[in-house]
Amino acid sequence: MGYYALTEETAVQYVKEQGYFEKEATIVCREIGDGNLNYVFHLHDGKRGIIVKQALPYAKVVGESWPLSLNRATIESSALQIFAKYVPEFVPKVYGHDKELAVIVMEDLSSLTIVRKGFIEGEEYPLLSEHVGRFLGKVLFYTSDFGLNTEEKRVLDGKFINPDLCKITEDLVFTDPFGNYETNDYERELQSVIEELWCDKNLKLQVAQYKYKFLTRKEALIHGDLHTGSIFASSKETKIIDPEFATFGPLGFDLGQFIANLLLNALSREEKREVVFFHIEKTWSYFVDTFTKLWILEGVETYTKEKQWLPIVLQHIFRDAVGFAGCEVIRRTIGLAHVVDLDGIVEKDRRIQVKKQALYLGRSLLLHQTKGADIQVFKTLFQHIVSEGGIKV
């Protein structure tokens, strides 16, 4: 029959035909996707539920004028299965993948909430940073040259060639926000600050270097879009979803994206900033602890036995995370895909002020010449930006 876009009605028919439910079952189906690229259906029969996610042949946020390969569903399914090999507790179970329809059938996570939404509503998720830090520590180590022999890594890399979605990252994270491109989206009150960034040659030189790192450094399998909207959580559980941007890339990329989205939440949620900074600090400490233990116990690369090599690697990861965080903060403020943390601020004057702070924070992160791997740098730069008279760096 070939590819066709599912509806709530045809999704019910599909799951029955594929044997996920009995043909006589009464199934309730809702389209629940709020993302930019896919349809997501929640189906349940009163006893159990499943999720059906279907990739569209175009970017939903733009329309059919922006075509995309359906292979990203295969990328996502493959990434979830790789992640499950190392950290099954932190990803949803995959029940099936239909390549022709670009469909993934997976575990129902409706008992959990999206972290971005929960944070905005005042949730704290005490185990979030531990879980994300451990997830990244294991996945990045085991898919890097430090934990995977080079032949296997090259074969795995070949399975995650993801040109369409990598191009989105190249454009929307590293290029468009730093110039006058039509994909940008911002309030006119930000124009003078934005033009200041566009004219900052030192800033653009830094962005150029981070873009080049993303283009060329195939260090490990990265999620590629790890933000608070791609994580479900409760007070006890964390599940990382939506790795359709997965590819081999820099070790510090996912860390930077995740921390950037925490910073955006901190800008908008003054009363919970200490909770956010707790998570930033703990994410890094759990990542370092996990990565270090695996390096010592399971390192396969010859030079993992050299004691001075690990601190250099961790410093390299941290420096990259700081710069990638800067790009992401700016992108989420004025680029194509915003975050509700900022856009949801009702009072316009405050929203504009917070967005200005976000732009200056992003610039500060990019221009900061990190020495060592001091996680406090995020809090220090943040406090400077939001303090009186500290909006310019």
Curated annotation (Swiss-Prot):
Gene3D superfamilies the record matches: 3.90.1200.10, Phosphorylase Kinase, domain 1
Keyword Ion transport: no
Residues noted as binding ATP in the record, renumbered to the chain: 38, 53, 107-109, 242-244
Pathway connected to this protein: Amino-acid biosynthesis; L-methionine biosynthesis via salvage pathway; S-methyl-5-thio-alpha-D-ribose 1-phosphate from S-methyl-5'-thioadenosine (hydrolase route): step 2/2
Reaction(s) catalysed (UniProt annotation): 5-(methylsulfanyl)-D-ribose + ATP = 5-(methylsulfanyl)-alpha-D-ribose 1-phosphate + ADP + H(+)
Disulfide pairings: none
Top EC class of this enzyme: transferase
Keywords: Amino-acid biosynthesis, ATP-binding, Kinase, Methionine biosynthesis, Nucleotide-binding, Transferase
Keyword ATP-binding found: yes
Function field: Catalyzes the phosphorylation of methylthioribose into methylthioribose-1-phosphate.
Subunit structure: Homodimer.
Protein name: Methylthioribose kinase
